Amino acid sequence: PALRIIPLAHSRATGMMDLADLKRKLSAETAAVYFENPSYLGSIETEGDTIAELAHQCGALLVVGADPSSCGVMAPPSRYGCDLVCGDIQALGMHMHYGGGLGGFIGCRDEERFVMEYPFRLFGIAETSVPGEWGFGDVAYSRTSFAQREQGKEFVGTAAALWGITAGVYLSLMGPKGMRELGATIMQKSQYAAARLSEIPGV
């Protein structure tokens, strides 16, 4: 197969990655190490910098799946050495309904080896001839399906682009302060729910 996924052990008590198991399974053939922070079970990985160091030592990338709702209160993946970050933007103002309201995001360092592989169109910002004015436009157009048809790296549909606008409006309305408040509220409610559930025998 072109790709082989090797699961890693984790602590049942904390949900954190078993670093000893990671060390055993890393090799020169490892392309990337991936983990979610927070995970789908709600655990928070606190050893991100160590995981990044171990991955980079064998030439692998560190890829982190992040919930944007958590980014207002948690350290961003870039802080602990992440090469690529990805996630779902459904939580950014999109109503839940049958089979819709979906979109994702990818982030990376400003390096050509990453950016040129993005599976969608790229837009850049530059100064115009009018002082203080900025313009936006397609970047690296030659890599798109418009230029190369089926050979292009980019593939994006109208629906995904529209949900991207929804997420952008949501973020602009929330602002940094609103995103911090959102993250703090989610953490507080989660801890409250866990405390109440733990009062039930057998839970």
Regions found by a protein language model. Name each.
Residues 6-8, 35, 55, 62-66, ...:
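General beta-strand structural signal in soluble alpha/beta enzymes
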Residues 89-203:
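Active-site C-terminal subdomain of aminotransferase-like
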Residues 1-38, 42-43, 50:
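PLP-dependent aminotransferase-class I/II
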Residues 17-18, 38-58, 69-76:
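Active-site core of PLP-dependent enzymes with the aminotransferase class I/II
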Residues 78-93:
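Conserved active-site segment immediately N-terminal to the catalytic lysine
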